[in-house]
A protein has these predicted regions:
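Terminal-region recognition feature
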Residues: 1-133, 144-146, 150-161, 180-246
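Active-site-proximal loop/turn and secondary-structure-junction residues that shape catalytic pockets
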Residues: 101-103, 138-140, 168
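Glycine-rich beta-to-alpha transition loops that act as phosphate-gripper elements at the mouths
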Residues: 135-140, 177-178
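Catalytic or ion-translocation cores adjacent to nucleophile or general acid/base/metal-coordination motifs
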Residues: 166-175, 182-186
Length: 246
């Protein structure tokens, strides 16, 4: 799996039941604007989204592709993730994300920043309404690092990095002495990550978590307000045996 030419798709295939994945919005690419006159039309704009099954349970998945423009976030890239959250919310299904990102696409300027902000806002809005699982599979820095913090369960693959600012920007700290972005530090010291390990180990834990999540979550819309008839957080906390085996 580690040598697969398309890591983003390989992660999805490893997570979901065989032949259950349905990709959505595969033809979406970046658009030309005043900020981005020479937009590159790259495959899926650097992120694969869709839905599939884990032991028969419906889940919605996004996976960033670091092979496309370094996995950077552009306007349409972020809007694809935003639309995935909206679809998952309508049916009360979990959202699972694989992050492998090179930051915001600077050439798209405020369009990319606004779209990224919308994703973070939506993740905050649905917290406790639908389950969110985030796996940092590569680099996750800057504004996108907020997304793992909002997730109900956060995972990191060995060798991945999670940070807002580079460790070297902290006075007196150097990454070769104390890499505060490493999976080991985030798990043992910061406590922001629930599970670390190889990709196979992390995916096994993610599948285990999905198997323990109630599948009768009902979300009712009232204008722009989301009402929680059966709150995911309340149901999950009531399950005393709900933990991740390490």
């Amino acid at each position: 799996m580690g040598n697969d030419s398309n890591q983003a798709q390989a992660r999805i295939n490893a997570l979901l039941d065989e032949n259950s994945f349905v990709e959505l919005q595969s033809l979406v690419t970046s658009r030309s604007t005043d900020f981005n006159l020479d937009a590159k039309k790259e495959p899926s704009d650097g992120v694969i989204i869709g839905h599939g099954l884990i032991d028969g349970t419906l889940v919605f998945v996004f996976s960033q592709n670091a092979d496309v423009l370094g996995g950077t976030i552009g306007e349409m890239h972020a809007k694809k993730i935003l639309s995935l959250y909206d679809m998952a919310l309508k049916v009360g299904a979990p959202v699972i994300g694989f992050i492998d990102c090179g930051g915001v696409r600077l050439q798209e300027s405020f369009d990319a920043l606004e779209a990224l902000g919308s994703v973070i806002e939506r993740a905050a809005d649905v917290k406790g309404v639908i389950p969110q699982l985030i796996c940092v599979a590569g680099q996750c820095g800057g504004g996108l690092s907020v997304l793992p913090a909002l997730a109900d369960f956060t995972f990191m693959v060995d060798g991945a990095s999670l940070f807002i600012n580079s460790p070297d920007t902290i006075t007196g700290n150097r990454s070769d002495e104390c890499d505060t972005s490493s999976a080991k530090f985030q798990f043992e010291e910061a406590g922001t990550v629930d599970k670390i390990g190889s990709l196979d180990e992390v995916i096994a834990s993610m599948r285990q978590v999905i198997s323990m999540i109630p599948n009768d979550i009902v979300v009712v819309f009232s204008n722009t307000t989301v009402q929680k008839h059966q709150c995911f957080g309340a149901q999950l906390s009531s399950q005393s045996n709900c933990h991740i085996h390490t």
